[in-house]
């Protein structure tokens, strides 16, 4: 793969591909269920503001609780609950996620969701997508360097 042609795939995805592949392969069935059900609580928390914009306050927790009404799989429920961590954590606050269980899965999921929802942000060329991608790129690089690269530049 020519990394230069992959402008919307962060470098960390290639740099840590063996670790990511091993972890994702090990939990493949659970990841599939997590990705299918991670927003299952959204219908129960939808709020439409005065401008017609849709909001889903606390949707990750509500989705976890909704999922647990139909499944006892706590592993998937925990991934659902933490689904927004990589979307809302600023790169400067990466240390709070370094030892988060299965942070690698959450980073990959956030990347997949960002690509899946690109049109909602105005497309891959939009400023909105670029900002979200840049934040996820920095966050993922800092987390994975801190966790796996003993000679990283983050000072950990």
Locations of regions flagged by a protein language model:
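Divalent metal-dependent catalytic cores for phosphoryl transfer on phosphate-bearing substrates
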Residues: 11-122
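Non-catalytic terminal/accessory segments
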Residues: 5-9
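Charged substrate- and nucleic-acid-binding regions of tRNA-handling and nucleotidyl-transfer enzymes
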Residues: 103-110, 114-156
